[in-house]
Every structure is written in structure tokens, then in C-alpha cells.
């Protein structure tokens, strides 16, 4: 009897195949294919195919394929942990950027030696080519099989809650499934609750490394047990893993926490508390330069500057919805203004006051403070507003995740007719300013509606999303979709910037809001006299000053361009007798607001130069006998190159020019390119100034 056939579409091409086929047979000739996208859903290669299916191949080196490989590596790690620690109870194990983690409940924390042992067990499991096999199970079967895994039982019983968290890697809204690891004889050697998909077998995991272990609360809540989390990375090839490790070594050298201490920029005193930074004079100089330029650009782009208090009555956040949606991220209330008589009876009711977590409610009150006309729109409000968010102590990280942060916060109110032009101008403004700070490699991410969680009409969501997409496409930048990733109140574009070593940072966000104008009953008078709701746009260009400071510090590895550098010019006299001449020049720079220092210590000249070089200052200004006799100074740059005998007036003009142009200068060549041709009789070259 002839084998029955089915009609399917494979990578866009119609095919007739045997009814019993799976992706394994369909793609048997291409070992780089490790999974399929079946009717739009990622599935294992072993998934049976049916008539009418649309099948797309997924290769190991694709984003989807790499994610599947990393999740399979998570299972291999969990299996290895339970071999090494049989009493370990399983939490969850999602994929994260570059790798994965898994949470375990164990008696003793994992040590570096434990990680080495676990890696060896993983290597053995990988070499044994264990096959991943999926089984659909009922809730009763899952509870029975996971009887010794209390955290898995919790996920099974609370499926709906689990779907809203990283536990969704284990739980599907459709069905429950187990994944068995089978040895070459087909025996089950390990199992885990998981929605999948997974690799055909473990040998597809070519390059991995366990990085570290850390404590983590179950489901991220301090009310839950403390678990041990193991982090790992995995890549399709060993070369990619090696390249990643090289990048991480460079990232460690650029760590803003390390550089901040070495360069005396900021600190986190224990007396103040976690996530609350203090900026030292040099760090504050950088902050001031960042803010000054931002203010200048906002003035040029017709923003109105506002200022709002740090605390407010809780009723404002009831109106905005923050107390409903965001209370866990807010500091506890302060009950104030209550008055009692001598008997303790309340004679005047008090109010709960909160530290503000966001500036937008107060900006809405400014908009609402009087009647608005369409002639006033677009109205662009801007503030460097400090906000306070209660981040768990285990989450705070240097300046990138803090509890007190200052946002360069803007809220734009416009008509629907103005929305496209406003968004276009806003994106161009954001990109221009980011480029001036030295970030030039961008892509955009468009977060669209979650069909199950949104406010506002489908019509306005569609209009706003299409408008954002048009604006993004007109920018010429790569646009990456984030389906369902928008907040409930509106779609968003985020600007993702790559730094000097290729890492991606989310910097600016442009967020439409259909919620707050309704909650605050914001209105303007339209040309026909009717009352209309404005379109509201949230925009944070830096995100926060603190986080953007950290990004720039790591991007430049502390070697800021002169306009941002905490010390822009450092004077080093060759000998004491030349100090007065040098001091006169440095004072003239300071009169023009150049940030200067002079090393008048007792150190020998060579040591002063070495110390100056370590400080990453853009311009080391040297004065020796020839400089003094010719009323000149010499420059030494970060790369060790030197420019000698520059007349003081020309030297000052060049320094001011490079600061004004906001260019990076690390060498003589950079300096020449920034300032044009040097004056007559001035030579560019390298001089030996390290001699004692």
C-alpha cells in the first residue's frame, strides 16, 4: 500500500511529503537546522507535520536557534547540578542575553570549584548526545511527576501567574509538557517541566561557560525563599565564545564602578544607603557639562523648562494610577500634617506624602493649571527631575540601577494632526544629541500593543503605532519589532545604542500615552471651540543622568572628549623655574571656564607626566625653557604624541575650539584634524618627555 502524503509549505515552497515525516527527516541533509517555526510557532524538529502546515527552518546560528540552544544548555546544567547535588530543587531556567541561568534551592551556596565540577558533568552529558523528547501531560500527571520539586508544583498550580513572569519558559497557556533527556538506548536519564522547544540532542551545544553563582529570591520577591542562581553563557561556535570572553575582559577594564573609584568621580557611602550615589567634584563637573549642553539643546528646540517638588500627596498618584500599578516600586508614605489635641484626638486630618517615582503627573498638573488653546500646541515641558524608586538591594548596580535618579524628562502635548511631525522631530533631536555625546551606532525598537492589556481604542493604537513605524523607517535606522512589548498605555520607540566595544544599551525612549490624558482630564480648545484630548508623549533622552553617565564612562573608558572631561587641561612644568609662565597660561584658560589643574608637586618631571597620563586628561600642557623664552607651551596627548612650541594665544584658541566642537582628541593627528593646519614653525611629532 502506498504511503500517504501531505501538502505543506517549506520555507515558502510548496512540497508533498510522506505523512509520517517530522522536521528531522525533512531537513536531514542540513545539520545546522535545529528546530522549525511551525505555523508561526517555534517547535522541536521531532514535531509531527500535518497537511497544510507552514514550516520554516531554524538554524543554530539564527537568533531563534541560538536562543533554543541556550535553553537546552540550561537543562544540561540543571541535570548536571542534580548529579553533583542530588538534593537540589529546581526553580526556573530562562534564556537571557548571551546565555542563561537556573535557580536552585540547595543547602550550601555554590563555590567556584562547584562550577568547575558542574561544567565537567555538563561536558559529559553533551558528549553523550542525549536526545530531548517532549511529552504533553495533564496537570495531575505533572503534579505527580514533580512531587519532589516544590517550586515546579507551585508553577503548575499557579499557571496564570507564571505566564506573566520568566517562569513562562516552563509553563504554556495551551498545555503542560515535560522534556525527557534520553540516552542512546532510549532510556530516560533526567526530566524537567518545560514548554520547549529544544535541540535535537545535546551535542549541538558547542561552546558554553558557567560564569558565576549568586543569591536570588524565588520569583524576585523578598517574601520568598532565597535560592542560588547559576549564570552561564553559550554560543553556536567556540570562536564566538572566545570573542565574547575577550569583550568581557575589556568590559571589566571599563567597568564604571572601577573607573569611578580610580578617577575619583563618585561613590556610594554606606552611611547613605544602597543605590544612592554621591558625585565628587570631578564627577559633578561631568554631570554639569552633560546638563549644560542638554539645556542648550532644549532651549534651541523650543522646550519650556519647569521644576517640580520631590514629594507630593498620595492622591496625585491615585489619579495617575501609580499607586495601583507601581506601588511596589515606590518608597513608603510619610504621614504628615495631622494635628491632635492634648487628649490625642485628631483635630486635623493628615495626608500620606510620597517621594515621586515619576515626573509626569506633576507635568500634567502644569498643563491643566489653566485653559489651553490649540495655538499653544505642541507644548514641550522639560525638567531635570530627580525621582526615587525602591529597587531591591540585590538589584541595584553601580549607576545603571539606582534608587535616586535624575531624568532629563520631557512631556510633549500636541494634537493628533501634529503627532507625526512631532515624533519625527523628536527622534531627530534625540539622535542628534546622542551623536554629540559620542554615540553613533544605533538601531530602533518598536514596542507594540499587547492584545490582552491596553487602554484606548484600537483605532488610536493603530494610528500611533503606524506613525511611530513610519517615523522610525524614515530615520534610515534598523527597526526591530517588539510585538506585544508596549506598556498598556501606548506604543513606544526605544533607541538602542552600541558602545565602543559593541555592547547594546537602551538609551532614549519615546512613549505615547493614551492613559494619563484621560485620568487627568487634560483638554485643549480646538479651532471649532470643542474640547479635545491632547496626545501625550513621554521622552527621556538620557534615560537618567546617572545611567547615561555610566554608559559614557564605559564607552570612553574614562578618556572623555575635552568638553566632557572633568579636567580638560593639566599643566606640568618641566622644572620649578618654568611654573610661573605655565601658571599664567593655565589661569588664562580658567578665565574662559576651561577646567584646569597644575601639578606643582615635588615629584620629578617624568613621574608627573606618567601620573598625568594615568588621569586620562585630554591635554597635558608642558612648559620648559624654550616654551618660556618663546611665550609658548607644548601639548602632550593621550597616545604619547606631542606638539611643541605652540604660541600661547594659538594654544588657547585651539583648546577652546576643540571644546566648542565637542570632538574627541587622543593624538596629534586628532588635534590637527580638529583645528586645521598648524601655525608656521610649529611641528607635529613625538617628543621624549619621560626622561628624568
Curated annotation (Swiss-Prot):
**Gene3D superfamilies the UniProt entry points to:** 3.30.54.20, Anticodon-binding domain, Bira Bifunctional Protein, Domain 2, Threonyl-trna Synthetase, Chain A, domain 2
GO MF, one term, reads:
threonine-tRNA ligase activity
Cofactor detail note = Binds 1 zinc ion per subunit.
Q: Which terms does the UniProt entry file under GO BP?
A: threonyl-tRNA aminoacylation
Q: What is its EC number?
A: 6.1.1.3
Q: Boundaries of each TGS domain copy?
A: 2-59
- Chief subcellular location equals cytoplasm
List the subcellular locations. Cytoplasm
Annotated binding of Zn(2+), by residue = 360, 411, 538
Gene Ontology annotations for the cellular component aspect, listed alphabetically: cytoplasm
Q: Where is this region: Catalytic?
A: 255-561
Q: Which reaction does it catalyse?
A: tRNA(Thr) + L-threonine + ATP = L-threonyl-tRNA(Thr) + AMP + diphosphate + H(+)
Extract the signal peptide range.
Answer: none
Q: What cofactor does its activity depend on?
A: Zn(2+)
List the keywords (alphabetical): Aminoacyl-tRNA synthetase, ATP-binding, Cytoplasm, Ligase, Metal-binding, Nucleotide-binding, Protein biosynthesis, RNA-binding, tRNA-binding, Zinc
Which class of enzymes does this protein belong to? ligase
Q: What does this protein do?
A: Catalyzes the attachment of threonine to tRNA(Thr) in a two-step reaction: L-threonine is first activated by ATP to form Thr-AMP and then transferred to the acceptor end of tRNA(Thr). Also edits incorrectly charged L-seryl-tRNA(Thr).
Family that this chain belongs to: Belongs to the class-II aminoacyl-tRNA synthetase family.
How it assembles, according to the record, is:
Homodimer.
Name recorded for this polypeptide: Threonine--tRNA ligase
Amino acid at each position: 500500500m502506498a504511503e500517504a502524503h501531505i501538502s505543506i509549505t517549506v520555507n515558502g515552497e510548496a512540497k508533498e511529503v510522506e505523512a509520517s515525516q517530522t522536521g528531522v527527516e525533512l531537513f536531514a541533509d542540513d545539520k545546522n537546522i535545529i528546530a522549525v517555526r511551525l505555523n508561526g510557532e517555534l517547535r522541536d524538529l521531532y514535531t509531527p507535520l500535518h497537511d497544510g502546515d507552514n514550516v520554516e527552518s531554524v538554524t543554530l546560528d539564527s537568533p531563534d536557534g541560538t536562543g533554543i540552544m541556550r535553553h537546552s544548555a540550561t537543562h544540561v546544567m540543571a541535570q548536571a547540578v542534580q548529579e553533583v547535588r542530588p538534593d537540589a530543587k529546581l526553580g526556573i531556567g530562562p534564556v537571557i542575553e548571551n546565555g542563561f541561568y537556573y535557580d536552585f534551592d540547595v543547602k550550601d551556596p555554590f563555590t567556584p570549584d562547584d562550577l568547575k565540577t558542574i561544567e565537567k558533568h555538563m561536558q559529559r552529558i553533551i558528549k553523550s548526545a542525549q536526545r530531548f523528547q517532549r511529552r504533553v501531560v495533564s496537570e495531575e500527571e505533572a503534579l505527580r511527576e514533580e512531587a519532589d520539586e516544590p517550586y515546579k508544583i507551585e508553577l503548575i498550580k499557579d499557571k496564570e501567574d507564571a505566564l506573566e513572569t520568566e517562569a513562562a519558559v516552563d509553563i504554556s497557556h495551551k498545555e503542560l509538557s515535560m522534556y525527557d533527556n534520553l540516552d542512546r538506548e532510549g532510556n530516560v536519564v533526567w526530566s524537567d517541566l518545560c514548554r520547549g522547544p529544544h535541540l535535537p540532542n545535546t551535542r549541538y551545544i558547542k561552546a558554553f561557560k558557567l560564569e558565576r553563582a549568586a543569591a536570588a529570591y524565588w520569583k524576585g520577591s523578598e517574601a520568598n525563599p532565597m535560592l542560588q542562581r547559576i549564570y552561564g553563557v553559550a554560543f553556536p561556535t567556540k570562536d564566538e565564545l572566545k570573542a565574547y570572553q575577550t569583550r568581557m575582559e575589556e568590559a571589566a577594564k571599563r567597568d564604571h564602578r572601577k573607573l569611578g573609584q580610580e578617577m575619583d568621580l563618585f561613590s556610594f557611602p554606606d552611611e547613605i544607603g544602597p543605590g544612592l550615589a554621591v558625585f565628587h567634584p570631578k564627577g559633578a563637573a561631568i554631570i554639569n557639562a552633560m546638563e549644560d549642553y542638554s539645556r542648550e539643546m532644549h532651549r534651541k528646540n523650543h522646550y519650556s523648562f519647569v521644576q517640580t517638588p520631590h514629594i507630593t500627596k498620595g492622591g496625585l498618584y491615585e489619579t495617575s494610577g501609580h499607586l495601583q500599578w507601581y506601588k511596589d516600586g515606590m518608597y513608603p508614605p510619610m504621614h504628615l500634617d495631622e494635628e491632635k489635641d492634648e487628649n490625642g484626638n485628631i483635630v486635623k486630618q493628615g495626608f500620606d506624602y510620597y517621594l515621586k517615582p515619576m515626573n509626569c503627573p506633576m507635568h500634567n498638573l502644569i498643563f491643566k493649571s489653566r485653559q489651553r488653546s490649540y495655538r499653544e500646541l505642541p507644548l514641550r515641558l522639560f525638567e531635570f527631575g530627580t525621582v526615587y524608586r525602591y529597587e531591591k538591594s540585590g538589584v541595584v548596580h553601580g549607576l545603571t540601577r539606582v534608587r535616586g535618579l535624575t531624568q532629563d524628562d520631557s512631556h510633549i502635548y500636541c494634537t493628533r494632526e501634529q503627532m507625526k511631525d512631532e515624533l519625527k522631530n523628536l527622534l531627530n533631536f534625540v539622535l542628534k544629541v546622542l551623536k554629540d555625546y559620542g554615540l553613533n551606532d544605533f538601531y530602533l525598537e518598536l514596542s507594540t500593543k499587547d492584545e490582552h492589556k491596553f487602554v484606548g481604542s484600537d483605532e488610536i493604537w493603530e494610528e500611533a503605532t503606524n506613525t511611530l513605524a513610519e517615523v522610525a523607517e524614515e530615520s534610515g535606522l534598523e527597526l526591530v519589532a517588539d510585538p506585544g512589548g508596549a506598556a498598556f498605555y501606548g506604543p513606544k520607540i526605544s533607541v538602542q545604542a552600541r558602545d565602543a566595544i559593541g555592547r547594546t544599551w537602551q538609551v532614549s525612549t519615546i512613549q505615547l500615552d493614551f492613559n494619563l490624558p484621560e485620568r487627568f482630564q487634560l483638554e485643549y480648545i480646538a479651532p471649532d471651540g470643542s474640547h479635545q484630548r491632547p496626545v501625550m508623549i513621554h521622552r527621556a533622552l538620557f534615560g537618567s543622568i546617572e545611567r547615561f553617565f555610566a554608559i559614557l564612562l564605559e564607552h570612553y573608558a574614562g578618556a572623555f572628549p575635552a568638553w566632557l572631561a572633568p579636567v580638560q587641561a593639566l599643566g606640568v612644568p618641566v622644572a620649578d623655574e618654568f611654573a610661573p609662565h605655565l601658571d599664567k597660561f593655565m589661569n588664562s584658560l580658567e578665565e574662559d571656564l576651561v577646567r584646569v589643574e597644575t601639578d606643582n608637586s615635588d615629584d620629578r618631571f617624568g613621574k608627573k607626566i606618567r601620573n598625568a597620563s594615568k588621569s586620562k586628561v585630554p591635554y597635558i600642557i608642558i612648559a620648559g625653557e624654550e616654551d618660556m623664552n618663546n611665550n609658548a607651551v607644548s601639548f602632550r596627548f593621550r597616545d604619547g604624541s606631542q606638539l611643541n612650541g605652540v604660541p600661547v594665544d594659538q594654544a588657547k584658541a585651539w583648546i577652546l575650539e576643540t571644546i566648542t566642537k565637542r570632538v574627541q582628541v587622543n593624538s596629534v593627528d586628532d588635534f590637527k584634524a580638529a583645528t586645521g593646519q598648524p601655525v608656521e614653525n610649529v611641528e607635529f611629532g613625538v617628543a621624549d618627555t619621560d626622561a628624568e
